[in-house]
Each structure stands twice: as structure tokens, then as C-alpha cells.
């Protein structure tokens, strides 16, 4: 089958990182990413299914790995070479449309009894990511055994497969996985109707977090920080009460929360601020901003995949902030244990998520696709994806 594969190569990673993630280097013959014919993944156990991807998104975590600036923390939790692509809508061999829930927890791996985290309905935190009939991997798209959405075939356990409602186009369904991540983040943040909430970043994760917060935990006021015009328009359409530019964010959040400003030697801080801030970029500057924007005793939710970033912990310490990660999905205790993917699939039709998707590229145009995705915001795009429908 035709697929893009990502290979573990320290020299290639160092070369790409030294280039600053230049797309010409990151997709060259000297990089970790290769396009070619590879064997189809084998069914690892009885009951597993073959899935033919239709659309598969290019995620920020994919770009971080391809661009050489991903955190190496995840390397031992990954097997190589793998076919990327964990945002997938596809078809089963009987023609039915499905989306894939990528987490490779105990149930998927056939491990009994399940580990404590899987028993809690948190397969993304599975203790057994190295065990069972498939190789190491937290998710489909980072596991050598399963394939991924950037190939013509992947394999999935029945527990990973969700039927796509007729009301959803393929384009909208391609965003169910990241939307489920954001639903999980919104529920972890737990905003109340008296809270002021700030979402930092308005790429795919930021925009979908705006939508998830508005739908599942609507606050008193929801403010999005967005850099580009298309992002600002979409943030408002998805439920933000106000959208502000990064350069104006500190002052605008100060006024919105009636906070006081104190100027120091090299930076300013707020006395007061947002009750909850969702950080949806994963860079040091945006993480630092999220901390600065949040009131004493408030909550910062890290939703965007961070790299090895430096953050000044003094503010976290002195302000007694609660900083929490929001990774993947599972079952949501605040929704009577319902699966995050089910919540996302039910909520998605009214959001018209297809407006966030495009342009679409063939696998053969992967170099153009990656380059476009690396500059998506500036180019007026949100989710660039591969189209394998033929």
C-alpha cells in the first residue's frame, strides 16, 4: 500500500531540528518522513478490523515530529517506523463510515485485568502501552503495528471504531478526534457560569476548545486570543464572546476581569485575571501568557501539545495556580461516564466543522501538504488534511 512512514533517525532529527523545521528539509530524502509502498498492517488478533482511511488530518503533534521540535519524552512510548495519522475518518470493508478513537489502552491490547487508569476510563494513560499483541504506542498513528491515517489501510480494534452519523460530512468527521480532545479538556477545566475563561491560541485545538467550552461548560465570558483574521472570525462563530489579538491580550484581559496591572523590570503581571485559561499552542511564550492571564488560585489547562519548553514557575508557585494537562479522551465522569467520542459525535453536527477543513492533498503531494500545514494560520487555513478517497 502507499503510505507515509516516519523513521527513527537521530542524524535526520538533528538535521531537521537544526534547520528550524524548514519544510524543504523536513520533507526531503534526508528527513524522517518517507513516501512509498509498504506492506499492509496485519490484523493482530481476532476481531480486529481493516479500515480504509478517507480523510486524515495533519495535526500539530505530527508537525512537531516532522519538524524536529517534538519533545523526546514520548520517544520510548512510540514504535518505529510508524504511519502517522490519528485524525481519521474512513470506511470498513462493508462500506460503513467510521471514525477511529486512537488510544491503544488495555482493552485494545487484550490485557486483563485492565490497568488502574483504563479501569477509570482513561485509556490515554494506560500503564500497558508496551504490552500485548501490538508494538509500543499510545495511539494509532504512533504505533508500528497499526498503521495510520496517512496510509491506504490501517487496522483497529472494535472498541476504537465509531459509526459516523449521516449528518456529518467526511470533512466534519475528520475533526471528531481533535474535538473529542477539546471536549475532554473543557470538562477537566470545569468552568462555571460565573467564570471568565480565556483560550490562548486559535488553531484547530484552540477553535475546537472554544466550541467545547461554549457547549459543555458555558462560562460567564469566553475570550479567545487569535492571531489571524480567519481564526478570529471562526472563534466568534464557534462561541467566543470576544476575540483579541496576542499583542493586546494582556491589557484586554486586564479590563475584562477588572484586574490590576503591576509593571516589573522585564514584564508586567496582573493582580486578578481569568478564572480558567486553556493553553492551546504548546510554546513557551503562550504557556507563559496563560499563566500571566490567570488569577490567583485559578486554573491553567494545557491542551496544545508542548515541546521541551521553559516556563517561569515562580508565578505558578506564588499564585497557587492549578496547572493540569488534558490529553486525549476516554470516559467522562462529569457526564455519567459517557465516552468522550460519543459526546463529540453528538455535538458536532450543529457546529458545521467542515468549514475548518481544507485544503486537501493527496499522499503524493505530501511535501506541499506539510509545507501548507506548517503555515496554515498565515494562509487562512485551519485543518489541512490528506484525501485518500481516490
Locate each region found by the language model.
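C-terminal capping/lid region of NAD(P)-dependent oxidoreductase domains
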Residues: 2-4, 13-18, 267, 271, ...
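Helix-to-beta-strand junctions that scaffold the AdoMet/dcAdoMet cofactor pocket
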Residues: 294-295
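NAD(P)H dinucleotide-binding glycine-rich loop of Rossmann-like/cofactor-binding domains
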Residues: 75, 86, 106-200
Amino acid at each position: 500500500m502507499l503510505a507515509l512512514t516516519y523513521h527513527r533517525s537521530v542524524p535526520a532529527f538533528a538535521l531537521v531540528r537544526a534547520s528550524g523545521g524548514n519544510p524543504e528539509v523536513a520533507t526531503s530524502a534526508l528527513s524522517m518522513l518517507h513516501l512509498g509502498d509498504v506492506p499492509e498492517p496485519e490484523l493482530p488478533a481476532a476481531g480486529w478490523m481493516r479500515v480504509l482511511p478517507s480523510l486524515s488530518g495533519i495535526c500539530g503533534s505530527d508537525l512537531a515530529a516532522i519538524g524536529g521540535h517534538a519533545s523526546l519524552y514520548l520517544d520510548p512510548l512510540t514504535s518505529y517506523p510508524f504511519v502517522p495519522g490519528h485524525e481519521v475518518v474512513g470506511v470498513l470493508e462493508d462500506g460503513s463510515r467510521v471514525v477511529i478513537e486512537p488510544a491503544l489502552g488495555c482493552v485494545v491490547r487484550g490485557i486483563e485485568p485492565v490497568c488502574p487508569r483504563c479501569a477509570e476510563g482513561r485509556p490515554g494513560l494506560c500503564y500497558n502501552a508496551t504490552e500485548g499483541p501490538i508494538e509500543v504506542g499510545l495511539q494509532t498513528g504512533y504505533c508500528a503495528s497499526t498503521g495510520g491515517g496517512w496510509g491506504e489501510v490501517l487496522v483497529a480494534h472494535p472498541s476504537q471504531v465509531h459509526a459516523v452519523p449521516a449528518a456529518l460530512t467526511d470533512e466534519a468527521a475528520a475533526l471528531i478526534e481533535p474535538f473529542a480532545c477539546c471536549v475532554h479538556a473543557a470538562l477537566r477545566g470545569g468552568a462555571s457560569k460565573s467564570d471568565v475563561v480565556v483560550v490562548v491560541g486559535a488553531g484547530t485545538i484552540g477553535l475546537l476548545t472554544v466550541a467545547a467550552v461554549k457547549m459543555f461548560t458555558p462560562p460567564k465570558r469566553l475570550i479567545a486570543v487569535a492571531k489571524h483574521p480567519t481564526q478570529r472570525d471562526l472563534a466568534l462563530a464557534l462561541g467566543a464572546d470576544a476575540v483579541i489579538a496576542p499583542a493586546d491580550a494582556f491589557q484586554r484581559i486586564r479590563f475584562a476581569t477588572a484586574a490590576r496591572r503591576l509593571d516589573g523590570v522585564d514584564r508586567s503581571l496582573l493582580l486578578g485575571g481569568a478564572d480558567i485559561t486553556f493553553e492551546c499552542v504548546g510554546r513557551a511564550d503562550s504557556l507563559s501568557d496563560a499563566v500571566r492571564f490567570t488569577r490567583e488560585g485559578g486554573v491553567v489547562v494545557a491542551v496544545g501539545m508542548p515541546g521541551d519548553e521553559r516556563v517561569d514557575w515562580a508565578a505558578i508557585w506564588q499564585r497557587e495556580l492549578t496547572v493540569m494537562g488534558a490529553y486525549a479522551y476516554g470516559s467522562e465522569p462529569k457526564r455519567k461516564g459517557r465516552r468522550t467520542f460519543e459526546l463529540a459525535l453528538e455535538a458536532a453536527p450543529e457546529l458545521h466543522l467542515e468549514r475548518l477543513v481544507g485544503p486537501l492533498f493527496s499522499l503524493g503531494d505530501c511535501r506541499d501538504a506539510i509545507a501548507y500545514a506548517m503555515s496554515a494560520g498565515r494562509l487562512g487555513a485551519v485543518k489541512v488534511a490528506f484525501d485518500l478517497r481516490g
